[in-house]
């Protein structure tokens, strides 16, 4: 009986705080908003700015941790769909709170052809409302922002299925660019 009560209290607690997190995120970033600028380094120490991608579509994806099952699956699908994304004029950039060294190892291991940026203090993820705190640990949420060539948010993905996310973005880019579903 006590275990059952604990279970219900835990579910209510998670539902309440999960909803608050969802509500804050969903009302904070809107399609059509200017994408928050960023200045972050990649694994080779090269600095990347949002403005570097002006004139192109940018798939800016936040992910929790290098070389974990879901993050690896997502990154490898982006890798495998790069030709399609590039044909649509899109660049892909991944961001997590991992170090540049961790990104370097992850990118080498899976032959990732796009930059992984180190947001070690979580400030960029926070500006996109894509940061969660587990007590003292900060982790990027699995969110993706499709940014149009003028720097506006064109699409926000907060419920990501890593097995088909990159193809979903390819399909959405085609619709955005042609207006045809």
Task: Name every feature range the model reports, one short phrase each.
Residues 5-37:
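N-proximal helix/coil linker or "cap" segments that precede and/or mark the start of modular domains
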Residues 29, 42-43, 147-148:
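Short, acidic, Ser/Thr-enriched surface-loop or helix-capping motifs
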Residues 35-36, 57, 141-143:
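Short loop/turn microsegments at loop-to-beta-strand junctions
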Residues 38-57:
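A short beta-strand-turn-helix
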Residues 51-72:
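Short active-site neighborhood of thiol/selenol oxidoreductases, capturing the structured segment around
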Residues 72-112, 120-125:
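Structural microenvironment flanking redox-active thiols in thiol-disulfide oxidoreductases
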Residues 139-181:
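Thiol-/selenol-based redox modules, centered on thioredoxin-like
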